[in-house]
Amino acid sequence: MQETPKANRLHIAIFGRRNAGKSSLINAISGQDIALVSNVAGTTTDPVYKTMELLPLGPIVLIDTAGLDDVGEIGELRIKKTKEVMDKTDLAILLFSAESTDYSLEKEWLAELTERKIPVIGVINKIDEAGSSFQSVDLEELFDVPFVKVSAKERLNIGRLKEAIQTHSPLDFERETIVGDLVKPKDIVILVAPQDIQAPKGRLILPQVQILRDLLDNDTLALTVKDTELEDMLSSLVRKPDLVITDSQVFHKVNAILPADVPLTSFSILMARYKGDLEMLVKGAKVINSLKPGDKVLIAEACTHHALQGDIGREKLPMWLNQKAGGALDIKIVAGVDFPEDLTGYKLVLHCGACMFNRKQLITRLIRAAEQNIPITNYGTAIAELNGILDRVTEKLL
């Protein structure tokens, strides 16, 4: 892996009307002609993502969206997709054209961004084309956000916009470390990574790579082994490991092998702590014990993938949950952005580790569940509860 994963980058979305210059602004910030620019209104349809480095801030994702004023049946669908972008937005740029005098839509969208607690920078574009009557101070008085005046086409004041992005970016868009606060230099940490058919050929899955890198950055003695070789690894060590991190699917096997005084957790639980609210997810996992046949359960995955035999979300978890409930549950499985607005009626929501989501996107889903009083947990905490070891695998983390 040579690049920072998209999920770990600050997500900056640009919202504005058609032909306000959103795509031109993307090109100006990135210094490349990567977004299609046209005088025809509605050139951008689906959201467009561009990863880049914005120094000194670091790796970011710029998101170009469809116009706020898109019309017709297709336009409504485009606006719906644009609103879905807000679920993953860490910082919003609300774009105004210096040629415009109607700001009613911008007020509506600012209200929604504010309600979602997304920091906003107002950008007035096309200042090179503005008439002598244009007064930016009037616009700035209407909107209580910081403003920058630019010409995306002529690349005017783009440096000032980058400075504003640096200044107003949220400091807490992600935790500084996944596991570094749990270990110290020279600690022995064993990663148990069973290589099944779901793993990409010749590669580890993303959470394993990220956690291994974090352990190396924190000067630990990181050892990676398959579950079938764990006992051999333990017997070869001169002292007990300080921490064992395993794939949740082999919790039962690893728990049986490890001495009780060796701390144990999983990749999924660490990612839940890194991106979400682990205490909420642990509380949600306890609900598994009260599920009854016929109860509605939602299983949500962050990414869409071709499910193979033994898929954790589509086969194993439903089977284990049905066994625990003593009969068939009413289980619905969704993937990608297909997460219901209305969760009422569900007894429990189970979410994957969300390695392909940024923190904002996962937190948005947790908040949605909390606002509707629906318990939510993730795969790792759920599997730990099903195996009766949830307290053990979270005791160092809460």
For each feature predicted by the language model, list its residue ranges.
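Long, well-ordered amphipathic alpha-helical subdomains in the mid-to-C-terminal portions
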Residues: 182-208
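Conserved hydrophobic helix-helix packing surfaces used for dimerization/oligomerization
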Residues: 12, 189, 295-297
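G-domain G4 guanine-recognition motif of GTPases
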Residues: 65, 96-99, 118-134, 148-156, ...
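Short, flexible loop segments at the rims of nucleotide/cofactor-binding pockets, characterized by
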Residues: 39, 68-74, 97-101, 168-170, ...
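Conserved C-terminal guanine-recognition region of P-loop GTPase G domains, centered on the G4
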Residues: 50-58, 77-147, 177-181, 204-220, ...
